[in-house]
């Protein structure tokens, strides 16, 4: 059986579609609980959710952040498997059955990711590698976008088409199917990360303890992408950069952390703004400046 954790924040109809994909067809028979953690949403998303014996809703009085909200859900998970699922994701007809079958047949990994299709049905990049300081330079300078096979991206494996199954460093938290028992080995998400990088940090700790993550190209789900944070672009960039620096400070040497900090503050904003100017996207330049102002104010 599977416990499913969904963190909601102003997800509108996305949340309803997500829940409907779980309780329809062949998926519901494998579900123990659907745990929805709401981070003080101001929209109507929760009011759309039907009453169902397997649905548990926890409403936070303030936005606790993604990591903390996930942990609230993880604490309630007692089934053999736990699925962390984004509210802007949807299961296909046999997704849960196929995940359980894959876990039990291969029986050599702790975390499973699947092919995530966007709204147009195209495969999206959903796996990442553990980053290194030099790869952050490749990203900050734009080299990884120009020639990703030569200058390997720091995180997202854009140099791989995701059309084959393989072991990976990390699968995206939008769909993260896990052995519930791993929480006893390595704990939950690190709540220092308000949002972003929490699943990367989790996967790194898993790997350090002998665990593995696996990507199955044969199992599919839908992920619209961006969720509600795509509507707050400056804040989204700020939170991403903030979590990047937290991750670097936690996992890199002092020199490595300082190098990532230099790339983040001095190289990346120039690269971003030059590319935006070349595209004539001047509105986005404002978002970049706002994000860095927030980063400086928060003493990253």
Predicted segments — roles?
Residues 82:
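Short aromatic/hydrophobic "clamp" motif used to bind/position activated sugar donors
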Residues 131-168:
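Short, flexible, basic/aromatic active-site loop/helix in glycosyltransferases
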Residues 59-77, 98:
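Glycine-rich, basic loop-to-helix element that forms the pyrophosphate-binding segment
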Residues 161-164, 169-220:
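A short, conserved alpha-helix in the catalytic core of glycosyltransferases
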């Amino acid at each position: 059986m599977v416990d499913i954790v969904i963190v909601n924040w102003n997800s509108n109809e996305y949340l309803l579609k997500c829940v409907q994909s779980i309780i329809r067809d062949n998926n519901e028979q494998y579900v123990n609980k659907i745990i929805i953690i709401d981070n003080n949403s101001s929209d109507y998303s929760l009011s759309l959710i039907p009453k169902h014996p397997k649905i548990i809703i926890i409403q936070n009085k303030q936005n606790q952040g993604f990591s903390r909200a996930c942990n609230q859900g993880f604490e309630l998970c007692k089934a053999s498997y736990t699925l962390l699922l984004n509210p802007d994701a949807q299961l296909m007809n046999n997704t849960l059955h196929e995940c359980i079958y894959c876990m039990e047949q291969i029986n050599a990994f702790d975390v499973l990711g699947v092919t995530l299709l966007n709204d147009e049905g195209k495969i999206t990049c959903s796996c990442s590698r553990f980053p290194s300081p030099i790869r952050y330079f490749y990203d900050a300078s734009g080299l990884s976008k120009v020639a990703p096979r030569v200058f390997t991206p720091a995180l997202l494996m854009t140099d791989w088409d995701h059309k084959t199954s393989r072991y990976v460093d990390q699968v995206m938290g939008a769909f993260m199917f896990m052995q519930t028992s791993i929480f006893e080995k390595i704990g939950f998400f690190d709540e220092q990360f308000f949002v972003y990088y929490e699943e990367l940090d989790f996967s790194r700790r898993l790997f350090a303890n002998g665990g593995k993550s696996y990507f199955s190209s044969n199992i599919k789900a839908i992920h619209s992408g961006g969720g509600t944070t795509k509507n707050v672009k400056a804040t989204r960039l700020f939170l991403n950069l903030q979590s990047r620096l937290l991750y670097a400070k936690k996992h890199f040497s002092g020199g490595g952390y300082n190098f990532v900090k230099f790339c983040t503050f001095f190289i990346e904003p120039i690269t971003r703004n030059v590319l935006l100017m070349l595209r004539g996207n001047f509105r986005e330049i404002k978002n970049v400046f706002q994000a860095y102002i927030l980063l400086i104010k928060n003493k990253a």
